[in-house]
Amino acid sequence: MPYRIRWEGHGVYRRFFGVITLAEFREANKEMRSDVRYEGIRYIISDYLEAQPAPEITEQDLRTYARHERLHFYDSPDIVQAIVATDLKNVQYARYYESLGVSPYCTADFATVADARWWIANNPRRGWNRPSLDATSTMAVPHV
């Protein structure tokens, strides 16, 4: 299993490592959503700092996956998702996924887990705030 799932007070932290296939990514989401704690969470942190997408994953795969994810919106509509990545391909895929506008979650990408946690802590409910960024910030612009 190229991922670990850790349940936290009001959310879940998922750490991926190695080369991740689309099937493994789907399995991680299935495992997360099938847990009884999923209905009560407020955030998902997906940490890809030690992972790379498998070369066969395409933007079409991401589009199809995003549409499928939209079906789960009402399972937990107040969830916010923070994607943590610095690998160029991971960042490109994260931003492409965000740009589709069909994700059931308010989604943003960050370069560090600390920045992701800050964003989550400063967004108590829907109507998420965009953080003000300065030239020294490591946070990416969230897409809401």
What are these regions (language model features)?
Residues M1-V144:
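Amphipathic, Lys/Arg-enriched alpha-helical "gate/interface" segment within cytosolic domains
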